[in-house]
Amino acid sequence: MVRAAALAALSRGATLTAVSQETGISRAALRAWLIDPAPKRPALACPACADHAFPPRPSYVYLLGMYLGDGCVSRLRRTMSLRITCADSWPQIMDECERAIVAVTGRPVGRVPCEGCTDLVNYWQHWPCLFPQHGPGRKHERMIKLAGWQADLVRTDPRPLVRGLQPSDGCRITNTVHRPLPSGVRTYSYPRYLFTNHSADILRIYTDALDLLGISWRRNRWNSISVARRDAVAALDGFVGPKA
């Protein structure tokens, strides 16, 4: 790299004039490099507010699910922060979430340990652009609606959204039923997925994605969705599976 070669020459005692004549770099630029040797990272363009359409990115759709489930966007001095809380019991989910953040922004992710969990934190001024659902108060106390471009991405492939939502606010359990019969009590066990959220809007986003995938579901409580049919569970097992 020209920058590294120029700094190396200056460190060996070459004058600014000599290095400028050899490399074609101005003396002013060379002085600035001496003060701050590290190259400046170019500002990342925001894909949501750019002139071109947001490209289909499974990492973003997955991150959208994680944000709706366990994330928040907040202001920190002159920038914005995304914070997603992940349980320490499921390190693979934490690692996948971190990879998704890096894939979307190209920026490093900090890990802030808490009791029983870890907050993944990333600073970027454009987080409100990528998550227009951001707002004051808790999510279940305000309207949550996907923007048109977000809905288009989800329709392209709803699986990453479900994969992000399900681990954050859901689980895969084994349901056991005891049925009395003339011959005695018979026990049935079968797996099922549950998804719980106090926001009716987020529940609808989740079930709309299941509908797009042709996965049957039912509401077992006012704030909970159950997926229990054998074919539906098998479908979720194909791209979600148990937490790990």
Where are these regions (language model features)?
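Internal intein/HINT superfamily modules and their associated LAGLIDADG
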Residues: M1-A244
